[in-house]
Amino acid sequence: MKTFSLAKFSLALLLLSLPFNFILTDGVGSVYLSTILIFLNFLIVVFFSKGQLIFKKEAFIAICVFIYFLLFTILNVLVSKGFLLKEQLIFSVIHLQLILVFLLGNYYSNYISKEVLFKFLFFVILLFSFRIFIDDWDKVFNLSSVRGFRVETIFAGGVNNFGLIVGLGFIISFFHLKKGMLKVISCLYFIIVIILTMSRGALFGLVITLFLVALYDSKGKILSSLLKTSFFLTVIGFIVLLYSNAAQDIALQFSERFLSIFSGETTIEQASSGRGLIVRDMYNNHIKNSSILEILFGHGMGSINYMVNGSPYESSHNFIVDVFYRNGILILLGYLALVIYLCFMFFKNRKGADLTLFGFFVFLHFEILVNPYVYAAQTGWIYGLFLAIFLNQNRLGHYKRKKIILE
């Protein structure tokens, strides 16, 4: 098998786990098809590439980081005499699959062009979004008003994660596809699907992404394209909703989810789904009681599991707070340094950077502040894939290298 074909096959296998994901078995926790495919994928690439996947500087660092996570997770389990053992084990697997996909993404970056990557992603995200209509057609217009109500909770890890993946499809449509009906139709389709999910994070994230990419674009073409496309999408969307039987329900739910805060019907606390309350509870009842070692090295990968207002939570719904509590302040500082480095590389390469990739970067990192999708067993691994691609895109001197994915 040729190396180039291996990379394409592996990427296709990885991405297709998104639309076709399901629970294989229940044991200590739910085992998803995507998790099995990630481990299988990794072993296949290691074998056929003769170890190229792991013999890289980035791979060595990533493996060391996971070993660091694992050591302090085991230490916390031993000190607590097995407390949260099941949760620590589950989230250790989630962290491991994130690391493995990062290693795979680092390998892909040498052999797959951005054109191939975007085509694969676009096709897979279409299939991913179609599944909600195929599996749960009678509930599509119920707008995910009840937690756990719709099928995307099973294969995507929740409504917000579903909206996140669909948002990536919109970014490809808007920034990568050439002018024409395909671009207009796909943009309109993805926006309508996001509105149906009522994911505020995904919708606001796209608005912020479009605005920041327009500012980032040194040629100034995105702003004019944004205004034109927005106008056509608004007109077409209005016509579709006007002649849709669900128009009234959509307008009512949209008003309640997105506009009620401005009318005073909803408080900021309610609009944020209680995120402020969760963080305050976490600080007052958990972080304040932490030892210096726990602050430095964390409480373990699966250490967040507590009740707030009678509801169970496995995340603070803020990735920065989660990393600090799970992995410690040292890892948090390292992660923030990595994000700052990526920002610096994007702006250093501004004239030649790909706007679609920058759109991914902005969107994923806005979402990570309000939606802890990284910790979803079904879809969180996608952050590892993009993190590897961002690192290869922004490496110094990447324009002179022949095998970098984004040349």
Positions of predicted regions on the chain:
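N-terminal signal-anchor transmembrane segment
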Residues: M1-K50, Y68-S80, L364
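Hydrophobic, aromatic-rich transmembrane alpha-helices
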Residues: K2, I36-L53, G167-H176, F211, ...
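Transmembrane alpha-helices of multi-pass inner-membrane enzymes
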Residues: F39, T356-E367, V374-E407
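Hydrophobic transmembrane alpha-helices and their immediate junctions
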Residues: G51, A59-F60, G180-L182, L215, ...
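Aromatic-anchored transmembrane helix interface
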Residues: A59-L71, G82-Y107, V116, F120-I125, ...
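Alpha-helical transmembrane segments of multi-pass inner-membrane proteins
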Residues: E115-N142, G157-D217
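Long extracytoplasmic/lumenal interhelical loops at the membrane interface
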Residues: F141-N142, F155, T266-N327
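Flexible juxtamembrane loops connecting transmembrane helices in multi-pass membrane enzymes
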Residues: L241-D281
